[in-house]
Regions:
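Alpha-helix-loop-beta-strand connector modules within alpha/beta enzyme cores
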Residues: 53-84, 106-114, 145-147, 195-218, ...
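Conserved N-terminal beta1-alpha1 strand-loop-helix module at the mouth
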Residues: 1-70, 76, 106, 152, ...
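Glycine-rich phosphate-binding active-site loops on the catalytic face of alpha/beta enzymes
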Residues: 89-104, 177-186, 235-253
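Conserved, mostly hydrophobic/aromatic
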Residues: 21, 34, 45, 90, ...
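Conserved anion-binding
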Residues: 85, 89-172, 261
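Hydrophobic faces of well-ordered beta-strands that scaffold small-molecule active sites
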Residues: 19-23, 42-44, 70-73, 90-92, ...
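Catalytic cores of alpha/beta
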Residues: 32, 36, 72, 77-92, ...
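N-terminal amphipathic alpha-helix/helix-capping segment at the start of soluble metabolic enzymes
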Residues: 1-22, 134-148, 204-205, 209-212
Length: 263
């Protein structure tokens, strides 16, 4: 089995409804639990999480061993090393323009042979990495598989990003556009109240524009009501968060029968 799992890109390019989970806890065991719970893929969160590169690599191994695709949310300057770890996709925050999205595509894709057609990237090539099986699966085959099969998800999290959603989604090489409701609410002056009407209206515009452009529209959906509403607006990739689910379960367990037994 090759280390690089390219199934996520295929799923994002299909019309499937996908349920993902952000995990910022630096633990391969948590990744395994996400797989066993039945999520379609895991988003290892290296924007807000505390995992170093070695732990990230182990989490990618855990996902691969469990048969679950994995992407990594990371900052732009970490793209090259994250891809070399063997991530099947990357998710980049705070993309506001089509020009920025195009630059990210160039960083994710390898250069093409002179006689080939398609997106011409600028990713540096090395076959000693986990992504290439430490050389076992290097060469042109690895380059072609990576260019075709590594997913790029960009995040829009500001009014500017929402206004440019259609143009961002239209960029060749962008597989999905994810609306970040929390930062969008902050950037609109609503703190983290993304349920406020102006924020919801912006989300509706963004999701609709992405879907109309023929790309997969994603969003954080923490309740069934949110998921149903966002699906009606064009989303088909929904994400939740490990820490939120764990804390909710912990609180329920900690309360136990206190309310009824009065102790």
């Amino acid at each position: 089995m090759r280390p690089l799992d390219t199934r996520l890109a295929d799923a994002l390019r299909s019309q499937l409804t996908l349920r993902a989970i952000f995990n910022g806890i630096p633990s391969p065991a948590i990744v395994e639990m996400c797989a066993f719970a039945g999520f379609d893929f895991v988003l290892i969160d290296n924007e807000h999480g505390s995992a170093d590169l070695q732990t990230t690599e182990h989490m990618l191994r855990a996902a691969r061993a469990c048969g679950m695709p994995a992407a990594v949310r990371c900052l732009e300057h970490d793209l090259a090393r994250t891809l070399d770890l063997g991530a099947g996709g990357v998710q980049v925050p705070m993309v506001n323009t089509a020009a920025h999205a195009s630059r990210l595509v160039e960083q994710v894709k390898y250069p093409l042979p002179a006689d080939a057609s398609g997106v011409r990237g600028q990713r540096g090539s090395a076959f000693s990495t986990r992504a290439a099986g430490y050389g076992a699966f290097g060469g042109p085959e690895h380059t072609r598989a990576s260019n075709a099969g590594v997913a790029l998800i960009v995040m829009i999290e500001t009014p500017e990003g929402i206004a440019n959603a259609a143009d961002i989604a239209a960029v060749d090489g962008v597989d999905a556009v994810f609306v970040g409701p929390n930062d969008l609410a902050h950037s609109m002056g609503h703190d983290n109240r993304w349920g406020d009407a102006p924020v919801q209206q912006a989300i509706e515009r963004g999701l609709g524009a992405i879907a109309a452009a023929g790309k997969c529209a994603g969003i954080l959906a923490l309740t069934l009501d949110e998921e149903q509403r966002y699906a009606a607006w064009g989303a088909r990739f929904f994400a939740t968060v490990t820490t939120g689910l764990i804390m909710r379960a912990f609180k329920d367990a900690a309360q136990g029968g206190r309310a009824k037994l009065d102790y």
